[in-house]
Swiss-Prot record:
The lineage of its organism: Eukaryota, Metazoa, Chordata, Craniata, Vertebrata. Residues 18-37, 217-262, 279-364 are annotated as: Disordered. It is found in: Cytoplasm, Cytosol; Nucleus. The keyword Transferase applies. Pathway: Protein modification; protein ubiquitination. The gene is rnf146. This is E3 ubiquitin-protein ligase rnf146. GO terms for molecular function: poly-ADP-D-ribose binding; ubiquitin protein ligase activity; ubiquitin-protein transferase activity; zinc ion binding. Transmembrane segments: none annotated. Keywords: Cytoplasm, Metal-binding, Nucleus, Transferase, Ubl conjugation pathway, Wnt signaling pathway, Zinc, Zinc-finger. One of its GO terms (cellular component) is cytoplasm.
Length: 364
């Protein structure tokens, strides 16, 4: 297990060669047994780093280990400092030459010059060196399947059908193959061979159009632990604009403001043929109002001159109303036969001089 000093190695200590595995090494005194720089250990998988990357907090991990940990939390596994959102697309590799060497067959390939690939979107990805060695060893021993731990997920490689899938999810399968090293490929273990030139320090950021494409690629690769991008693009959903419903015109006061329809015109014509007009009801309403006004009994208990004049006016009104319709005459006779509003019995002889029967005559 790595000690505390080995876990917190920085780039300066690696490049200068002053501290390796807790031992001081003088500068310029290269060891004949280890001509290259030692590979740091990953605090997550506790193994030698495969394609080591350096976070902004200067902690070093495997690229796939950082990718697997970022699905649970966008923070460093040691100091809990936030990791940039675009770090997986523009990682800071400690040795970019190692990535190119593994892609060209310099390391991670067997003596036969073959490498292992898994299917991606519009191309093939090469497995990392550690996984390639495990697959080559199982294939040389004639095994039918092999298990691989990639970014915290356990995968099963079916060497007979040449497919891989997660052990707890058999439905999602991806093709794999064993081929020569120098075939066209997209990259190694999710790391592209042609990285974005804007990823270098101090470069001008790319325009918004490039950022949208990068976000789409990141969403595609989130569906797999090994950096494949065969999943359906998980772009941000765009809301559909729904226009507001148009309210119907409000009828103020219950009267239609639109022109009369054909049904209204037909109704008016039918009423005209029957000699019925809405204006014919106005005299009847006026007579009813006059009757209500004259229905109040005199407080003095006897007829006055004003009462006699009222009777004369009512008689004249009755003569004028004789020219109205027969139905109105019957209605008028029914009003004349009503008892007086006083409630007392009225004599028929007393009502003979009063056309409406509402004005009583007191005998002395």
């Amino acid at each position: 297990m790595a000690s505390c000093g080995e876990v917190n190695l920085t780039v300066d200590s690696l490049t200068s060669g002053k501290k390796v595995s807790g031992e001081a090494v003088p500068e310029g005194s290269g060891s004949p047994s280890s001509p290259s720089l030692p590979v740091p250990e990953c605090p997550i998988c506790l193994q030698s780093c495969v394609h080591p990357v350096r976070l902004p907090c200067r902690h070093i991990f495997c690229f796939l280990c950082v990718k697997g940990a970022s699905w649970h939390s966008k923070r460093c596994a040691l100091c809990r400092r936030e990791v940039p959102e675009d770090f997986l697309e523009r990682p800071t590799l400690l040795s970019p030459e190692e990535l190119k060497a593994s892609a060209t067959g310099g390391c991670g390939t067997g003596s036969s010059g073959h490498a292992w690939y898994y299917e991606g979107r519009n191309g093939w990805w090469q497995y990392d060196e550690r996984t390639s060695r495990e697959l080559e060893d199982a294939f040389s021993k004639g095994k039918k399947s092999a298990e691989m731990l990639i970014a915290g997920f356990l995968y099963v490689a079916d060497l007979e059908n040449m497919v891989q899938y997660r052990r707890n999810e058999h439905g999602r399968r991806r093709r794999m193959k064993r081929d020569v090293v120098d075939i066209p490929k997209k990259g190694v273990a999710g790391l592209r061979l042609d990285p974005d030139p804007n990823s270098s320090a101090g470069a001008v950021p790319a325009p918004a159009v490039v950022d949208v494409s990068v976000d789409g690629a990141a969403a595609e690769r989130e569906s797999s632990a090994d950096g494949a991008d065969t999943g359906v693009s998980g772009g941000r959903p765009q809301g559909t604009f729904v226009p507001a419903p148009i309210r119907p015109p409000t009828i103020l006061g219950g009267h239609l403001t639109s022109p009369a329809s054909s049904s209204d015109i037909q109704l008016v014509q039918t009423l005209a043929q029957l000699n019925i007009s809405p204006n014919e009801q106005e005299p009847e309403e006026e007579d009813a109002e006059d009757e209500d006004d004259s229905a109040a009994p005199d407080a003095s208990g006897y007829d006055s001159e004003s009462g006699t004049s009222d009777d004369d006016e009512q008689v004249e009104d009755e003569d004028e109303n004789e020219h109205t319709d027969g139905s109105q005459g019957k209605h008028r006779l029914q009003q004349l036969n009503r008892p007086p509003p006083g409630g007392g019995p009225a004599n028929s002889g007393d009502r003979s001089g009063c056309p409406d029967g509402q004005c009583t005559v007191t005998k002395v």
